Amino acid sequence: MASFIISGSRGTDDPTMATLPFMAAKVAKEQGHDVVLWLWNEAVTLGRKGTGDHVTGVNLTPLKDLLAAVQAAGVQIWVCGACAVARQISSGDLVAGASIKGMPDYIKAVAERDRTIAF
């Protein structure tokens, strides 16, 4: 199987685009692929406990359900450290399975993966 890093940059400002990386991560994991979900820019807010509870894209599964699915599947959720600091998000604010990572971690993961998918 393949390995993916799926990145999301949109948060509550665009519910549809915010939901798509979680949907892609869920489907990729269900197909047996290795997945890292990288949240950066406004998407880091989705890594904060409770933020995704009220996000639903147009005709899409609610984000809270997709988040629960990727958490249950063991998908690593990486939250951009600089983006989190800018939004006053600390590791204690994050959902289960999420961790704060830096650009060196992201670049290393991109270099090691078969594919990168960006939303």
Regions of interest found by a model, annotated:
Residues I5-T19, T51:
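Short, glycine-rich nucleotide/cofactor-binding loops
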Residues A18-Q31:
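Histidine-anchored nucleotide/phosphate-binding helix
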Residues K29, Q71, V110-A111:
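Anion (oxyanion) recognition and catalysis
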Residues A43-G57:
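N-terminal beta-loop-helix "entrance" segment that forms/cooperates
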Residues D53-G81:
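A glycine-rich helix N-cap at a beta->alpha junction
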Residues V35-W40, I77-G81:
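Short internal beta-strands
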Residues A86-E112, T116-F119:
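C-terminal structural segments of small proteins and small subunits
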Residues N41-V44, A84:
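Short beta-alpha junction loops
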